[in-house]
Swiss-Prot record:
Family: Belongs to the GTP-dependent DPCK family.
Positions that bind GTP: D40, V41, V42, D59, E112
GO biological process, one term: coenzyme A biosynthetic process
Alphabetized Pfam families for the sequence: DUF359
Enzyme class: transferase
Protein name: GTP-dependent dephospho-CoA kinase
Gene Ontology molecular function, alphabetical: GTP binding; kinase activity
Length: 172
């Protein structure tokens, strides 16, 4: 498991791509593109617009409040756990699998906000990733070699931590 230390959190408050203040503005950049989405509202907006993403990462919440309505039953469904402020190996692996097998929803039990980083690392060149920027709009991230490099740089901000086993905790 990897966690994002407090000293690096400010880096993740800035959009990692181009910020659009309305969803309608973003739609004109999507024809002919492979689209991945991170977040329930962005994914639901794509579905309502008749442009389902090839890969979606959702957690059933928006701004920490329950959010119903993201359901793509014909897609492969992956269920992973991921805490706020972190990236589990399961989530990282799921982004790699989904990026190579489109038609996948990653349902996160916990929080999916930081999943854009490993998703950008694994997404094919030319893919567009959309995610919400709370209170501001939608971020469009075009996957280029430079963006992949930036995602890898951001990934190094996370510190690997080990979760002790019960035997380690109790010295058994």
């Amino acid at each position: 498991m990897r966690i994002l230390p407090a000293r690096h959190r400010q880096l993740f408050k800035e959009p990692f791509g181009t910020l659009f203040h309305s969803f309608e503005e973003v739609l004109k950049f999507l024809p002919g593109k492979t689209v991945f989405s991170v977040g329930d509202v962005v994914t639901a907006n794509l579905l309502r617009a008749g442009r389902p993403p090839e890969v979606a990462i959702v957690d059933g919440h928006t701004m920490r409040q329950p959010y119903p309505g993201v359901n793509i039953p014909e897609y492969h469904q992956l269920l992973v756990k991921n805490p706020a402020g972190g990236l589990t190996e399961d989530l990282i692996d799921a982004t790699q699998i989904a990026a190579s097998r489109q038609g996948t929803v990653i349902q996160v039990e916990g929080e999916e906000d930081l999943a854009v980083v490993p998703l950008a690392m694994h997404a094919p060149l030319g893919t567009v990733i959309l995610y919400g920027q709370p209170g501001e709009g939608v971020v469009l991230l075009s996957i280029t070699p430079a963006m992949k490099k930036r995602a890898e740089e951001l990934f190094t901000c996370f510190e690997e931590v080990s979760t002790p086993t019960a035997r380690e905790v109790f010295n058994i």
